[in-house]
Amino acid sequence: MNFLHLKYLTEVEKYESISKAAQHLYINQPRLSKIIKEIEEEANIKIFERHNKGVVPTTKGREFLSQAKKIVQEVDYLKNMYQDDPHKLNLDICVPRSSYISEAFIEYLKMDNNMKKKLNLNYRETNSIDTIQNVYDGENNLGIVRFPLRDQDYYFNILNLKELTYEKLFTFDYQILISKDNPLKDKDIYMKDLKKQIELKHGDIHIQEDHHNHKHMNIYERGIQFELLNEIPETYMWVAPMPKKLLKQNDFVLKTCKDKKIPYVDYLIYRKGYVLSKEDQNFIECLKNVIEQVK
């Protein structure tokens, strides 16, 4: 039994399939099956039960895998402690579509001559459920999840079940983004005022659920969203607070809705046992600085 084999076991548990784990690990299935059998014989327990859809851990197997994951995490901890390289820039993060987060990413790239270093960057935008799964699966080291404050317990249950560490970043109300040519620019805005406007929807955030009573377009590309806001005055978007610099660059106006306030919250997440690298810490610092600016 060695460390690498323990890591193989945790992959089998994650994918609930020997064949899928073998594909992910780039080894053949018979070899992986043999390793599992050897470990089961050495530990004198049955770790997995086979069935027609894959494998599931036995009761003893869950206990064994729990300890195996702790060992894997401790080894990863040691590796991360000495992995920082002043000549390399490593960052791996999954986030919601949000201008303040992308602004923090840009500020991070600009600090300490980061762009002169060898780059290994993975910045992915997606929804909260996919972010949780990506971080749990090890596809991303860091994640930012966003959800309504009223759903906090539901998401905490998922995060705890997947043994992810979470830290609150920011609580806010969604605001209305319009161009300076929008007729609502100088008015107090109420929900009824939006009925004659076109909502540009993006991501998995749904502020207005009455789809049949208001005009909307689903737009998932950030560049065209901003173009539409500028070119078609009677359009708007629900957005998280945005940096003033970005508003000024695009001639946008950010307005509050007087009769629609739904608090949302952003959380930073990562796997338990994962040690934040120097690059991770620098990005989080940039993130918190931008949050202070948009509050």
Task: Enumerate the predicted regions with their spans.
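Short helix-boundary/capping micro-motifs
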Residues: 10-28
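N-terminal winged-helix
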Residues: 30, 85-133
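A short LG(V/I)-centered, amphipathic sequence patch enriched
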Residues: 40-57
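Secondary-structure junction motif
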Residues: 101-107, 152, 184-216, 277
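Short beta-strand-centered segments that line the small-molecule binding cleft or hinge
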Residues: 107-111, 128-174, 253-254
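Hydrophobic hinge/microswitch elements
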Residues: 136-140, 204-255
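Flexible hinge/capping segments at coil-to-helix
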Residues: 158-199
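A late-sequence structural motif
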Residues: 255-295
